[in-house]
Amino acid sequence: MGRSGKLPSGVSAKLKRWKKGHSSDSNPAICRHRQAARSRFFSRPSGRSDLTVDAVKLHNELQSGSLRLGKSEAPETPMEEEAELVLTEKSSGTFLSGLSDCTNVTFSKVQRFWESNSAAHKEICAVLAAVTEVIRSQGGKETETEYFAALMTTMEAVESPESLAAVAYLLNLVLKRVPSPVLIKKFSDTSKAFMDIMSAQASSGSTSVLRWVLSCLATLLRKQDLEAWGYPVTLQVYHGLLSFTVHPKPKIRKAAQHGVCSVLKGSEFMFEKAPAHHPAAISTAKFCIQEIEKSGGSKEATTTLHMLTLLKDLLPCFPEGLVKSCSETLLRVMTLSHVLVTACAMQAFHSLFHARPGLSTLSAELNAQIITALYDYVPSENDLQPLLAWLKVMEKAHINLVRLQWDLGLGHLPRFFGTAVTCLLSPHSQVLTAATQSLKEILKECVAPHMADIGSVTSSASGPAQSVAKMFRAVEEGLTYKFHAAWSSVLQLLCVFFEACGRQAHPVMRKCLQSLCDLRLSPHFPHTAALDQAVGAAVTSMGPEVVLQAVPLEIDGSEETLDFPRSWLLPVIRDHVQETRLGFFTTYFLPLANTLKSKAMDLAQAGSTVESKIYDTLQWQMWTLLPGFCTRPTDVAISFKGLARTLGMAISERPDLRVTVCQALRTLITKGCQAEADRAEVSRFAKNFLPILFNLYGQPVAAGDTPAPRRAVLETIRTYLTITDTQLVNSLLEKASEKVLDPASSDFTRLSVLDLVVALAPCADEAAISKLYSTIRPYLESKAHGVQKKAYRVLEEVCASPQGPGALFVQSHLEDLKKTLLDSLRSTSSPAKRPRLKCLLHIVRKLSAEHKEFITALIPEVILCTKEVSVGARKNAFALLVEMGHAFLRFGSNQEEALQCYLVLIYPGLVGAVTMVSCSILALTHLLFEFKGLMGTSTVEQLLENVCLLLASRTRDVVKSALGFIKVAVTVMDVAHLAKHVQLVMEAIGKLSDDMRRHFRMKLRNLFTKFIRKFGFELVKRLLPEEYHRVLVNIRKAEARAKRHRALSQAAVEEEEEEEEEEEPAQGKGDSIEEILADSEDEEDNEEEERSRGKEQRKLARQRSRAWLKEGGGDEPLNFLDPKVAQRVLATQPGPGRGRKKDHGFKVSADGRLIIREEADGNKMEEEEGAKGEDEEMADPMEDVIIRNKKHQKLKHQKEAEEEELEIPPQYQAGGSGIHRPVAKKAMPGAEYKAKKAKGDVKKKGRPDPYAYIPLNRSKLNRRKKMKLQGQFKGLVKAARRGSQVGHKNRRKDRRP
């Protein structure tokens, strides 16, 4: 129990406080609700009005026409005439009547400000309304030029900062749309007005005026042509803008920097026939260098940081000489070892290289010099963020150097590889990832594209080849044991290296392959998959022949032991071999596989079953390499003839190899016969392979065997026929037709031969196809369903040919085909429907308008097929319906009328038999979805009305189809048109019988959900009977629940994205000119946010700007003249506290002894450490003392309350055996309800009623433990009964008088 009268800990801080002596006051200090109530009774508001004196003055002067733009001149330009016309008459409208109906789209954003409570927004609205009214009163057309003239005149008249900011904001909007000739003509007067305001407002407290004036000035300068930049006055105005890039106020500085970037990158003459550099680039660069040198050595380096931020965007815009000067300046300021300055300088270099500028900006020599200089600024491997930035900058620098001059760039890469590989020793995983990614990108971007030019890479090579060898040696060093923690990253690098350079550099990589194989054999090697991937990359690029020369298989069939330490190479080669010599398989693997097969057979005869199985598996693995060797081989024309006989024998005599060899043949034909000579060579052996494959396919599958080999044989036949000579195909087709007609052929043989005919038909000539058609025509009406289906499959393959003999046959026999298909309609079996519909689909695609009757005759059959059992038949039926619709669209000139004619042919099905009605609705549903853009509104509405009538059917099939149609209609129809029929649909659904409503409850629920989303809950509820209301309420609850869940999920996703953005390194602004010229028109809407965010950023900046100096080792003094002294300036706090270490529960003293304290002492130490951590961040010692005292007082009060409520548990915990056995009791479910001072359980507020619960436990399935559980359950039941009886007796006693 807590102390009487004392509030719980933490509650007192939430209560309302009052000053001493005012505890009895009852009148509230805040009375905004009373003031709001008074304003309803026509009293004057007590607060400050938004109508200022300046606004009234501005309005009066605009109305009187006394304001003019500049001196009175003769009306030489259209702009001056418009200005005079605008300001002559008085307005007769109200004060703000020109705001809501302003016709110029430039100010569409301002019209949204009217409802804002911001005084700045209301001032903008007032100024725009006044200017618009004056322009209208003068008969103006409200063009951008008229607004520009009126606003410039207004700017000279207003005095208060609020009005001036409003005018400048509107000018900023309108200047972007004013024609360039106008701004060029009025540049002198306009720029003078802006410069005067900038001078007057430079030291004022308000930032709004300067922000918008600077933006206006940047837009004005951007519109000037190249000739105007030759005048000194233009550069003088630009320098005025440039001087504000070092302004102490961030919003002004940001506006100026944005303006400078937009001028240098986005001036109008920089797009077409642009000069090499902007005329103002030189003076800008000199200004940046001067400002950095002026303030570079100061302690805070604020101006330096501002200039570096500007250089980050502008460095790629400068000429080469100034880029060199800026780079030297950046390198000089980096020697100051100021952490933030170094980071910003790195960002500037990154933006320079990332922009990939031309030679006029960055030459290859200068790029190389910068790379060399940056090696003096390599951060410490323990300094995480600076090292990540340095690696990224160097990656971009080398990629850009290779782009400019590849041989020079390759010469610089070995040094970077050596440095980056050293980074793999860093304890930070982020550094490992960044270094690995940088090296991989360089290999892909810089090395791989030039390997063909480099040629063979050997250990004695020179030039670029020598550089590649050095780079590989640097990566290969990562396989030594000191890099064992980074072996995963090293293997990734080797994988990319093999892919990029393996073909040319394999002489220097052989030793590495041997090391990899030895490493894989080491016990408990954890990176087997990555190593296999690296060796696989070597196989792909070098070829298996080179890899096996470096690391032989060591398998020859004469082994004394069965270890086979390098047998793991066979699966690796299988998965990665391609584009290699097919002859190598013939000369190396084929003889070895035969030797191992013989060895396996000998061992099997000798009774050594296990050894025989091992050798048999090895030879089978060697055969599985064949498909890879057949993938784009380099010597098909030379090597295939030596392999063809072996493959034929393997197919016919080795069932275990049949699938593999067939796959190899298919791969060779599809991926290895691109050259005509290769194609001819493989085609030459078709007369040998096809008869073997035909005979195999004709053999029945033995009992217990899988049909996979048979399918593989048929697929191989199809593939081989694509390159077979037509005469051979015709002869094979003729023999197959004879076999089909042979009465002695069994059903299995006839079906198998028909499968072969299906494969042969598309490759035969027209005469052979005509003869085949005569052969299969009687089978289209066969009563044997399998034969009939195969006959239709033959016809389908012939009709599917888009060109060639098949297309010619269809064109010449079209009438005969139509007659045959219509005559065989009634005799078509269900299995034959799928190929028949497919055949009709291909024929309908080729029909013209005169064949309209044929399509009309097909419609009833196709509609009924939408309910076929076969999924394929249903799909083909729907596809054919859509194709018929497209045919009608081809036939007619008006698409809507043509589609209506097609639908009229389907409508009669709605009044036929039940099955026909259901199928017709399904067909109309599919057509509605497919042709929703072509159906007229009246057609869709008519369909919907008819389907609603069919909802009254007593057949579930019809109702199901009708509900499906309504669901599609709701999705497809426009809300405005659907709204007319909501009542009709709801009434039809409301009249459904109870049985229908119960059966289709899920469909109805989905339908109601769609209607509620479109028309609202109340309307749907009003239109439906009361028995549906409960469902509707549940739907509304489910929708609200889903909406809340989506909102929470979205918030979580956004939070994760924000965290990821915070974790990402800082990047420069967008590279595109569109981002630079994007409107920066957001006013002070987010000032409060920025202000609060600014405090956090300043706190973070103080932390980030801190630097730590790493001392020398031992008593050795730190040498500040050492060129690598910059590496000792760390942005990350050094020492053991930075790493994530294991907490053993005890503090350790400086000499390594454990410090064991009581818990209270530990809390005290934590408090002192927490206070100490805060001390380091406090600037004022007195402020620190106050904060610490307050903190200790608060902790003291909390501690006192906790000591009264909690009792410290003993430190000793039982364990071990004997008297030290575990004594903790198991937590029993429901134990928290047990009464402390009585028997039984008690109810607790906010918790469910007491319960007895036996948890499910898998161990209770044990027979012995099951009996124990039964006893436990019986005890619970008895206790419950006993408690019930006691309670019953007590209630009876209470009822007695």
Swiss-Prot record:
Main location: nucleus
Top-rank lineage group of the source organism: Eukaryota
Pfam families documented for this protein: RRP12_HEAT
Location in the cell: Nucleus, Nucleolus; Nucleus membrane
Coiled-coil features, chain-numbered ranges: none
Glycyl lysine isopeptide (Lys-Gly) (interchain with G-Cter in SUMO1) cross-link site: K71
Listed Basic and acidic residues bias regions: 1090-1099, 1154-1173, 1233-1243
Phosphothreonine carried by residues: T77, T88
Gene Ontology annotations for the cellular component aspect, listed alphabetically: cytosol; intracellular membrane-bounded organelle; nuclear membrane; nucleolus; plasma membrane
Topology within the bilayer: Single-pass membrane protein
Gene name as annotated: RRP12
Protein name: RRP12-like protein
Region feature (Disordered): 1-29, 1047-1101, 1131-1297
Keyword Protease: no
Keyword Membrane: yes
Comp. bias regions, Basic residues: 1188-1197, 1288-1297
Molecular functions (GO terms): RNA binding
Cross-referenced Gene3D superfamilies: Leucine-rich Repeat Variant
Tissue: Weakly expressed. Expressed at intermediate level in testis and ovary.
Transmembrane parts of this sequence: 903-923
Biased composition (Acidic residues): 1053-1065, 1073-1089, 1174-1183
InterPro entries: ARM-like, ARM-type_fold, RRP12, RRP12-like_dom
Family of this protein: Belongs to the RRP12 family.
Positions of post-translational Phosphoserine modification: S49, S66, S72, S97, S1049, S1072, S1080
